[in-house]
Amino acid sequence: MRILFSLDNYDHATGGAEMSMQALAHQIALRGHEVRVFQRDRSVRTYDDGPIHVHTHPLPASHLIRDQDLDTIRWNRHWEPLLDHFINETRFDLIVTQNRLLFSTVKVATRRHIPVAVFVRAFSMFCPLQFRSREALTECDRRCETCLPWRMRLKYRFIRRNLGQYEAGLRSATLLIANSIYMRDVLHRFYNLEAEVVYPAIEWKRYESPTRRADRVLFVKPQYVKGLPIFLQIAAQMRDTPFLVAGKIGRHTRRKFRGLDNVECLGWVKHMKDVYARTRVLLGPSIWPEPFGRVFVEAAANGIPSIASARGGIPEAVGKGGILIKDIFDSSRWVEALRRLENPTVYAICAENAYAHAKKFTAAESLNQFIRSVHKAIGLEL
């Protein structure tokens, strides 16, 4: 069977959506299917990613002012004929897509009567601000024009056009796949559409550390939406606890860490397994209602329990392998939870539960969920 992945980003980024799609593509190829990828890139080229044939093509974007909404409109306008021409050369049995090129991909696939599966992993198709600090199911009133900053209001018609095209693409897809039950519920609330749930594929070998010298509390991506102000309060109140911070830190943010001698800032980290080797607890005080929360599963694969916000899809990623905080802006709740995990008995139970929960998110299990969803909706046997 021939399967095409039509994507704006397959392997030139390190986000969860890209890594999950790479893992799925490889799992499908290992089953003997012919897998090709057609992705946006800076130049026209063809190369092999293991058993997968990757083809790239550039798309025009403004060189002066980068604007995601305008670029998305421009990209899809040019991607449609490029994809149409690419499909002329090979007959595909299934097309898989996600994110910014989904509506042009669905349009071409529908016109050619090829089944198309769309992964719903991001908030961009529902909210121009991607619910930076609002809970999508309970706090969004769907009146975009009232909460946009004034600079975005000036291009509101382009924002509405993109949202409309995303909706049209979702409605025309043969199969919709959400990366969590939470995202499935968001899709139903906003567009009254149903989706199958396929959890992200986590390739354990990327994150499992054979040696552990764990004594640190880890915070990943020091950004406001990830809970930076909450973390700073926690670190200031727990001077006796050593913390690690992994992720790029700008000059303005770095100033906020002054005086916190118990915090070690690692900067951007390529191999997270080295960080997990030093981690005893993962801290996730996210203000943003994350669609899933891949980092919690990565940590759990090493038997590391998490203390995390009870928002978005995070509870699904944490499971019973940690402690969830509802009142996220009360730093005392986080401190109390960290103190609880200082108890060896409590920690051992959470660590064991975390490792057991992580087994639900292997690449093989994600593939099985995908196969069942495709067979149910399309009737194809992968």
Residues covered by each model-derived region:
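A charged, aromatic-enriched C-terminal amphipathic alpha-helix characteristic of glycosyltransferases
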Residues: 73-74, 345-375
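Conserved active-site histidine-acidic residue motif and adjacent donor-binding/catalytic loop
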Residues: 249, 261-278, 287-289, 328
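Short His-centered aromatic/hydrophobic patch
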Residues: 76, 97-102, 120
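Conserved catalytic-core segment of nucleotide-activated headgroup transferases in glycan assembly
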Residues: 189, 204-256, 265
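Membrane-proximal helix-turn-helix segments that form the acceptor-binding/catalytic region
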Residues: 137-175
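Active-site proximal beta-strand in glycosyltransferases
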Residues: 94, 109-148, 177, 196
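Acidic donor-binding loop of glycosyltransferase active sites
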Residues: 174, 277-291, 304
